[in-house]
């Protein structure tokens, strides 16, 4: 009987690394106009669903990891699960796509995949202002034959490579996959998989590497040691970056008791830093919805900031998402009821785990050999008496401008913890 079998396993590995640094790199061949043109309404609809999924997943991760740093890439997870859904059928595919916050009564499944195809094409455009690598890869057990339709769609829609792998030798397979991942993320992600089950048949990997430079850099000489208030009873010493007389998008949200500042990169992408008032973090987290992000973006307006203080930090996280995704109603794919018959003729395939590893560095360090120039804008006609210090837990969202995709989302509770 099906209930008594030992299920062949499919694992998803999700990995992402990002660095936010200070060097102003001048474009050589690609103009901002060339990079940004082509964004469609469909792309914004996709971004809306991805944002809804991002906030839902964030709430679960924050709930499961109280008083800890939370950093993940909703974009990476969305792409990987959408990729997986290519091979899902029946209630399994419905759960995955609805869990990703798509309305299947309004949007055809094929249109969703075409939306991700367009998104990946946008992300793959070359730029001298931004280092961004996104890819999908399949590691397939030797002798296992993928269905032609799945292989073709995986390549056409998700530009996925496929590598034959001997999972019956789990140590060798693990080294192969981890080395591949390490190479694709410039050494930032190591040991994505700690161990592999010899019953594994397929591993789907999505990776994202992101590195950008601040449009207006921080001066390392201005970085100083300062106290960060992790909680009422705990403070830690952190390197605090500082910049004065800065003009940047700013918004004071009296309704949600928080302050926002947006720092842009030379690529016009941006990092949104959200500082709740003392004791208001949980209230803010409970109200995270896509409409709130839209309201924030519409309300941000350039203001003069007398002094901005932001901790320099490097945070790494490692999550197993099976239980958390189940809370978002993505369940069947992890059980013997999974229908992944669109991947292979082996109809007893199921997902064993979704592993996500993220690394995010925010600092003033630059790229070796690049030009290190940043331009400050004069603010004589703008109120420049606003001081802002991120010296207690705050939220961060890194948004790609041309697709409105959240590439990173998280909470910095303790910048001193790697």
Swiss-Prot record:
Is Zinc there in the keyword field? no
In which broad location class does this protein mainly occur, judging by the first location in its UniProt entry?
A: cytoplasm
Q: Which UniProt keywords apply?
A: Cytoplasmic vesicle, Glycoprotein, Protease inhibitor, Secreted, Serine protease inhibitor, Signal
Cross-referenced CDD domains, in alphabetical order? serpinA3_A1AC
Subunit (UniProt): Homodimer.
- Described function: Serine protease inhibitor.
Q: Which PROSITE patterns match?
A: SERPIN
The signal peptide, as residue positions, is 1-25
Name the source's superkingdom.
Eukaryota
**Naturally occurring in which organism (per UniProt):** Bos taurus (Bovine)
Carbohydrate attachment sites?
103, 183, 233, 268
Q: Which Pfam families match?
A: Serpin (PF00079)
The molecular function GO annotations come to: serine-type endopeptidase inhibitor activity
Q: Which Gene3D superfamilies match?
A: Alpha-1-antitrypsin, domain 1 (2.30.39.10), Antithrombin, subunit I, domain 2 (3.30.497.10)
What is a single cellular component term in the Gene Ontology annotation? cytoplasmic vesicle
Protein name (Swiss-Prot/TrEMBL): Serpin A3-8
Subcellular location, record wording: Cytoplasmic vesicle, Secretory vesicle, Chromaffin granule; Secreted
Family, similarity comment:
Belongs to the serpin family.
